[in-house]
Swiss-Prot record:
This is 2-oxopropyl-CoM reductase, carboxylating. The gene is xecC. Its cofactor is FAD. InterPro entries: FAD/NAD-bd_sf (IPR036188), FAD/NAD-binding_dom (IPR023753), FAD/NAD-linked_Rdtase_dimer_sf (IPR016156), Pyr_nucl-diS_OxRdtase_dimer (IPR004099). GO terms for molecular function: 2-oxopropyl-CoM reductase (carboxylating) activity. It comes from Xanthobacter autotrophicus (strain ATCC BAA-1158 / Py2).
């Protein structure tokens, strides 16, 4: 084992990126990055097993509180799989999907090229991501060492001995606590042929795609991952078939919003087959996928393809640690924790995707910080709930709180404010209109593509219960709007805000149109 003692070396961000790339490309697995303060005599308050979002943010918080921490991670960089082959790549792919939908909609018009029969390379975009991903890795290694003064051992899987002891880089480290932050991996499918060449998940797509897929893509799954990648594949000009076991995008609770999203996907040519179960993946003589067979409500369906994408969620990486430490697990393999993020084993905490859903960045980062605070003596609970949510299709879809049907079922007398309004022209009006949707709003026959937005309000209390937006640019606002809604935001207070016109969300000005009414009615 070759170990680079990096403690007294001070690399720039670019130097870090180059070093990481060299380690990743090394045929022997590369050197261990050893950044440990041997002059600090204190016992570690916590060793973080994993340096992804939960481990890195938790470490930074613990260090800021005056504690001593150590991260041990199998990757040669901090930040985990998210910026390497998980959540960040699809943002690039979704940018491409939005641009391509615009270009295809206005094909041959204005300055747009003729996109008829144009097929865009999937591998070309994947290669673009691969070539640029080490820059962010370099930033995180640099920032964590030079600015946050974190201790870490990277490119070195941790060997957990017990609830206070970890072996790494040929040395044994002791800590008062362990914080497990090893994340989750892609879900899989238990059918014949699933290991054929040409069957990918989000990680192997980035790491292993070495050919340009043919004219048909099959996506298995119907939630975030499946939809986000599926829309990208569709936008490249390929037939895209989604095989969904139940119904797609059930996480969008408002039926009208969900219907708008699915209608736009289908309008782009996506084939969504609900109630389907894949029974086998057929291989050719060379072990490469040649077809997918599924049982659908209309009987058996066989789809010829050389490219299958599994968008089946995430599975916590809990098995090995559970066996070593005796951790209690939940039905989906998640490590069970209490409100203080403590596991069933004394002095062992678990955070991030390892503890199950929601498998979101905010939960990873916050749970890491809350675990650190508990380790440092605070008695503080964390249970993620009532959070805003988001996904990509060809659009950006943001939502929070209650949908209309959910609010009615809960006993609320509700009114809604939405754009476009319910009219005889339906969606075929030039509103909503804002950044990135103006061409759709004013284009001939494309007004219905300019987006959809809606807020749900309790007519008696005047409080905003939920908000839903399909378009572009609203995600950032939803982060803050969610806090205000949890604090009891009313339609009157919303209407009294200052909009930055033309704002992606029209909620402020539309609320102002109704706020003067003693008895609220829908708009």
């Amino acid at each position: 084992m070759k170990v680079w003692n990096a403690r007294n070396d001070h690399l720039t961000i670019n130097q870090w990126a180059t070093r990481i790339d060299e380690i990743l490309e090394a045929p022997d697995g590369g050197e261990v990055i050893y950044n440990v303060d041997e002059n600090d005599p204190r016992e570690y308050d916590a060793i973080f097993i994993g340096g992804g979002a939960a481990g890195r943010f938790g470490s930074a918080y613990l260090r800021a509180m005056g504690g001593r921490q150590l991260i041990v991670d199998r990757w040669p960089f901090l930040g985990g799989s998210c910026p390497h082959n998980a959540c960040v790549p699809h943002h690039l792919f979704s940018d491409c999907a939005a641009e391509l939908m615009l270009a295809r909609t206005f094909s041959g018009q204005y300055w747009f090229p003729d996109m008829t029969e144009k097929v865009v390379g999937i591998k070309e975009v994947v290669d673009l991501f691969r070539a640029g991903r080490n820059g962010p890795h370099g930033i995180m290694n640099f920032q964590s060492k030079e600015q946050l003064n974190l201790e870490y051992i990277l490119n070195c899987p941790a060997k957990v001995i017990d609830n206070h002891t970890v072996e790494a880089a040929g040395k044994v480290f002791k800590a008062k606590n362990l914080i497990l932050a090893v994340g989750a991996g892609p879900g899989t499918l238990d059918v014949p042929g699933v290991n054929a060449k040409g069957v990918f998940d989000h990680a192997t797509l980035v790491e292993e795609l070495d050919y340009e897929p043919g004219s048909t893509v099959v996506v298995v799954g119907g939630s975030k991952t499946a939809v986000e990648y599926g829309c990208f594949f569709n936008a490249t000009g390929r037939r895209t078939v989604m095989l969904v076991r139940t119904e797609p995008l059930k996480l969008i609770k408002d039926n009208e919003t969900r219907a708008y999203v699915l209608d736009r996907m289908k309008e782009q040519g996506m084939e969504i087959i609900s109630g389907s179960n894949v029974t086998r993946i057929e291989e050719d003589a060379n072990g490469r996928v040649q077809a997918v067979v599924a049982m659908t409500p209309n009987g058996e369906m066989r789809i010829e393809t050389d490219f299958v994408f599994l968008g089946l969620g995430e599975q916590p990486r809990s098995a090995e640690l559970a066996k070593i430490l005796g951790l209690d697990l939940g039905p989906k393999g998640e490590v069970l924790v209490n409100e203080y993020l403590q596991t069933s084993v004394p002095n062992v905490y678990a955070v991030g995707d390892l503890i199950g859903g929601p498998m979101e960045m905010f939960k990873a980062r916050k749970s890491g910080c809350y675990a650190a605070r508990n380790v440092m003596g605070e008695k503080i609970s964390y249970t993620p709930k009532n959070y805003p949510d988001f996904l990509h299709t060809h659009y950006e879809v943001s939502f929070l709180g209650m949908g209309e049907e959910e609010a009615r079922a809960a006993g609320h007398e509700i009114v809604t404010i939405k754009m476009p309004p319910d009219t005889e022209n339906g969606l075929n009006v030039a509103l909503p209109a804002s950044d990135r949707t103006m061409l759709y709003a004013f284009g001939k026959g494309t007004a219905h593509m300019s987006g959809f937005q809606k807020i749900v309000i309790d007519a008696k209390t005047r409080k905003v219960l939920g908000a839903h937006h399909v378009g572009y640019g609203a995600k950032d606002a939803f982060q803050y709007l969610n806090v205000l809604i949890k604090q009891g935001l009313t339609v009157d207070e919303l209407g009294d805000m200052d909009e930055l016109f033309l704002n992606p969300t029209h909620f402020i000005q539309l609320s102002r149109l109704r706020a003067g009414s003693k008895n609220l009615v829908s708009l």
